[in-house]
Amino acid sequence: MNYNEAVKLLTSQGKFRIELGLDRISRALERLGNPQDKLQYIHVAGTNGKGSVCAIISTILQEAGMKVGLYTSPHIFEYTERIMISGVEITKFDFAFYIDKITKIIEDINLTEFEILTVVMFKYFADKNVDIVVLETGLGGRFDATNIIKSNLCAVITHIDYDHTERLGNTLSQIAFEKAGIIKPNSAVITSEGYEIFKDIADENNSLFMLVAPFEDTSNLALNGLHQQQNLSLALATIKYLFPKISPVQIQKALKKVKNPFRFEFIESKNMIVDVAHNPNGIMALKNNLDYYYPNEHKRFIFGCLNNKDYASMIYQLFEAKDEIYFYHFNNPNSVTIDELQDVCPYPSKEFKEKFDYTDGKLTIVCGSFYMMKELCSKL
């Protein structure tokens, strides 16, 4: 099996099929000897900011000399982006090898795409003897496939807001409860969110509850944006709690190396910002960043999103009458149509069809979904 065949097999499982629950992945991992039990974890959940927190933590641990496994989702360009060891993606050869090997063993268990990837990740990291895994949840926490782990060094919970409400609940308290499912016995939970449920579940599990305030000095952090204050505070609190001997010099050196593509990322050659903000809270953070860093720029937006998102709220938050607005319908069965987007937009808009003259002095902002970025980047 080669890489393309592995991807084809994965997508045949239903690329956007989501079935929360731990029974299937538990049976699959048992057949492989439960490789997840051989590893140590920092487990990260939350609505927004998970990827940035994971990137900061893993980079600091790498700088301190550890062999660090990093598991994130979704990917932008290739599946291999999701599984990394010390900043290096799993090779396409290894990815195909593990997909082929594992799916033959568990072929009678109807795993989702995300569950297969999670099983591959556990087996790969165990085989490579990583020192620690920085583990990002896929959706929610309590019944997310990553929560098959029995213990963690600590749980980290980032900002909580409305997203995936059809699965996680319609109130912030319900969503927080689902995220709190990653809190394990005799461990710790580090969060910037003061929900009582976090402390209650921590107490029930004899685990430390640590509430941290935003860390304001992000001047050395390679990631841009006001919202990174909160992400940095969580990452640094986690490092200082678990690894107090990591020096300030190592931390500052690592912060300058952190990479997390398409998070308020500025592409100078095109005077363009690319941001995977894909829910109302993420769009609000993007809007705040644009108002703060580029208050007087003539802005041109390219926006597309999935139909399970509150795109009406995102559109109302983001756009102003003076903006140029372009909508993009990408190749995804759940992509919102141009007509649907235009129906809720209070301002004139057009369909994005071809690249612009990027020397015209306008700031182009691309946002709305992870899933359109690979396709759209080829047209920019």
What label would you give each PLM region?
Residues M1-F16:
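Charged, amphipathic alpha-helical linker segments immediately N-terminal to NTP-binding catalytic cores
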Residues A6, L22, S26-D37, E63-K150, ...:
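ATP-dependent carboxylate-amine ligase catalytic core
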Residues S12-S26:
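N-terminal pre-Walker A segment at the start of P-loop NTPase domains
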Residues K38, D127, I132-L135, F143-V156, ...:
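Nucleotide phosphate-binding/pyrophosphate-handling subdomain across enzymes
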Residues Q40-V44, S52-G69:
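A conserved segment at the C-terminal end of the G1
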Residues Y71, A188-E193, F301-G304, E324-N331:
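Short internal beta-strands
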Residues R142-F143, S151-N206:
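Conserved catalytic-core segment of NTP-binding enzymes
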Residues E193-M210, G225, N271-M272, A312-I365:
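C-terminal helical cap/extension that packs against the catalytic core
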